[in-house]
Amino acid sequence: MASLQISGSVKFEPFVGFNRIRHFRPIASLGFPRFRRRFSIGRSLLLRRSSSFSGDSRESDEERFITDAERDGSGSVLGFQLTPPGDQQTVSTSTGEITHHEEKKEAIDQIVMADFGVPGNRAVEEGAAEVGIPSGKAEVVNNLVFVTSEAAPYSKTGGLGDVCGSLPIALAGRGHRVMVISPRYLNGTAADKNYARAKDLGIRVTVNCFGGSQEVSFYHEYRDGVDWVFVDHKSYHRPGNPYGDSKGAFGDNQFRFTLLCHAACEAPLVLPLGGFTYGEKSLFLVNDWHAGLVPILLAAKYRPYGVYKDARSILIIHNLAHQGVEPAATYTNLGLPSEWYGAVGWVFPTWARTHALDTGEAVNVLKGAIVTSDRIITVSQGYAWEITTVEGGYGLQDLLSSRKSVINGITNGINVDEWNPSTDEHIPFHYSADDVSEKIKCKMALQKELGLPIRPECPMIGFIGRLDYQKGIDLIQTAGPDLMVDDIQFVMLGSGDPKYESWMRSMEETYRDKFRGWVGFNVPISHRITAGCDILLMPSRFEPCGLNQLYAMRYGTIPVVHGTGGLRDTVENFNPYAEGGAGTGTGWVFTPLSKDSMVSALRLAAATYREYKQSWEGLMRRGMTRNYSWENAAVQYEQVFQWVFMDPPYVS
């Protein structure tokens, strides 16, 4: 009979002929209510405890969950190993204790572990080199569990989806075991086919939140070395994007993402992916507020009972402006003990309250994640500093400042295979840093496609992004008449605020030979604009990282950006006099954020394009040879992984 064994100490035996969900009663010492956990794995499983003495096996028929007796030498729960039918050989799946070589530990200890988020500090990037981490494989491998509301190509609305679709693959390539957990969105469109290869694992988990028992199931696809796990529930099956539709944000988003977080905490314990679970010694990487309940649950509902005591959590902040704030009365919906309200409790300032009797009390999930996570990563070094300021902290600056010693900034990477001008299937001509002669043909093809006069000598400026206040679209609107006086062409691609969409259409009607606006988003045209334009404009008010400037530099298109967040970190301001007149830099960084400073930077860039071709080619090649691959970012993440296990986990 096929059996499920755990390192010789615990054995699962299937009941022959049964195919129903079986309820397991957790052991009393864990303190969980009886209805807390329920799952099925195809046939029902009977858990028998067995121990070996002098070759004899003794079994107890008591049905139970794993106790301390079934842990390895470090105290971690052993993973589940599926034994092939007819083969009763025991296979050990102990995770083992993560250790560090003494010489590496000494090197790590020499790193100054403070103020990593301050702009200009390269501790994270240099740390990997200091301890001699190999470029191909990680020195210490981990069980990594990404929890996210979106992951490309399955679901994507912005940079978050790009990060969670690419970084896990890079880390898996370096030897880590990686799981990505996100909802299984079905909205009745062609995008549903993205989940076609994901198979139902036949496992059901029941969790307690929102005043009752909620059952979810799991789908799984193994791709590019990563376990892609999708939490399935009817609340994820509706038209629109992951967060809302044309009418606005979904009213039950708190429920939908609370469900995701509870399921994510259970997944490493119950999903036998590849034959065995990830187990308790997992490192959770939770992304933005949607996954922010995970570190709170680990601290409030698991560690007090000895579960996940060896796990750690890292909060990755992609955009601090979104915090998951809901009325205080919704706290009981989160499935947390009553005494943990202080972790997520939040009070709005007086000026933000709606009426005189409004106390301002609310629940802030991201605040709770900041309090309980073991370490915090932002998507650029500049943003790590900005979130501790009044201007960039969105009310959380004091809390973040108090945790400054555990905040690290790591710049996002890009998919260098998808964004490669020498092989890009979306552009008509290919080129590289060694030979950029075909780029001008991409420009002429774009002018023809958009119906603009074909003028290869005319500087062409592009903008790709959301049409909203954060992206500085109002600044472009104000500067439009001034820019149209110059001998330039301007192309914009994006959607968002209807008033800016209307403005784009009116600009195109007024300046038929100079301006084109494409309302919406189209992947092929975004590639062609990136390749065909000479300059890419990004006047964002704040930009945690930004990806378009990285794509632009990869394609030899010069970025002109506002000096904020990741834009300031990744674009080096052009200096034509450095290096004996050879010049340094990859673009123009303007500040302050004003129409005059932006127009001035654009005019400097256009003049350089027209009059100083050698300097322009230097700008192009320096940008094209920069390394912004995910493999480079993965090495920096590994340094933080080592640091997070040096300290005990958050408990209370």
Swiss-Prot record:
In this chain, ADP-alpha-D-glucose is annotated as bound at K156
* Biological process (GO), any one: starch biosynthetic process
Disrupted gene: resulting phenotype?
No visible phenotype under normal growth conditions, but mutant plants have reduced starch content in leaves.
* SUPFAM superfamilies registered for this protein in UniProt: UDP-Glycosyltransferase/glycogen phosphorylase
Q: In which tissues is it expressed?
A: Expressed in roots, leaves, stems, buds and flowers.
Q: Where in the cell is it found?
A: Plastid, Chloroplast; Plastid, Amyloplast
> Where is this protein's transit peptide?
1-49
Keyword check for Chloroplast, yes or no.
yes
Q: Which UniProt keywords apply?
A: Amyloplast, Chloroplast, Glycosyltransferase, Plastid, Starch biosynthesis, Transferase, Transit peptide
> S-adenosyl-L-methionine among the record's keywords?
no
What does the record give as its pathway? Answer: Glycan biosynthesis; starch biosynthesis
Q: Name one Pfam family in it.
A: Glycos_transf_1
**Entry's EC annotation:** 2.4.1.21
The induction annotation reads:
Circadian-regulation with the lowest levels at the end of the dark period.
What GO MF terms are annotated?
Answer: alpha-1,4-glucan glucosyltransferase (ADP-glucose donor) activity; alpha-1,4-glucan glucosyltransferase (UDP-glucose donor) activity
Question: According to its UniProt record, which reaction does this protein catalyse?
Answer: [(1->4)-alpha-D-glucosyl](n) + ADP-alpha-D-glucose = [(1->4)-alpha-D-glucosyl](n+1) + ADP + H(+)
Gene Ontology CC terms: amyloplast; chloroplast; chloroplast stroma; plastid
InterPro entries for the chain? Glyco_trans_1, GS/SS, Starch_synth_cat_dom
Say what the protein does: Involved in the synthesis of short glycan chains within amylopectin in leaves. Is required to generate chains up to about a degree of polymerization of 10 (DP10).
Family, similarity comment: Belongs to the glycosyltransferase 1 family. Bacterial/plant glycogen synthase subfamily.
Q: What is this protein called?
A: Starch synthase 1, chloroplastic/amyloplastic
Q: Which organism is it from?
A: Arabidopsis thaliana
